[in-house]
Amino acid sequence: GGGANRALSSSSNGLEKRPKLRFPGFDEPWNESKLSACFAKNIKKNTDGRISNVICNSAKMGLIPQRDYFDKDIANSDNTSGYYIIEHNDFVYNPRKSSDAPYGPISRYACPDAGIVSPLYLCFRAKGDVDTNFFEWYFRSFAWHRYIYMTGDSGARHDRVSIKDDDFFSMPIRFPSSIEQKKIASFLSAIERRISFQQLLVDNLKKYKRGV
């Protein structure tokens, strides 16, 4: 949302070295690197068909089981051998554009059980001292959109971003120390929980008024 965008991208391109809004005690510049320094492509496939938990990457709901999204299983075990296996805290990029995700959603897989995703998706996994909660918020912001806009080729299909894997992992990113990453992610998550709770109160009040 807007809060994440303001917290994670204080400049026009989202790559401010020293964000204007900081927690007390943190004043060192953010690290500057490529996505490949923090993440590696995940290419493990479901060759033996062992995993049947097909996961969809929805712009609104994130990574959820296909059976929950469509109310039934669409893919069958005969055609999932080419699907990628994802595990807890892996990230998945769905290049399909939508009004909610103009450059396609990048979502973190929060479920504990392994799942499989379409080979049309790009899967990647954190390496080293990376806080996946922070980067979940990072990818929910628009900090990376300009790079995809400048680098990707949407000419082939207007509804889908076309970007080479090497170009995707060359994406420039800026991020703070792991301690500050955790603090930022915790802060944004707390705000989101507060907003959700307030929305629940509003919804319940509306239901009450309709019933009176």
Name what the model sees in each region.
Residues 114-120, 153-179:
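A short glycine-rich beta-alpha junction/loop motif
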Residues 1, 5-12, 20-24, 184-195:
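Hydrophobic structural patches
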Residues 48-56, 150-152:
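Short coil/turn segments at secondary-structure boundaries
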Residues 13-16, 183, 195-210:
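Extended intrinsically disordered, low-complexity coil regions enriched in Ser, Thr, Gly, Ala
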Residues 36-47, 58-91:
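Sequence-specific dsDNA recognition surfaces
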Residues 81-144, 154-157:
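A short beta-sheet element
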Residues 18-46:
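Non-catalytic DNA-recognition/assembly elements of restriction-modification systems
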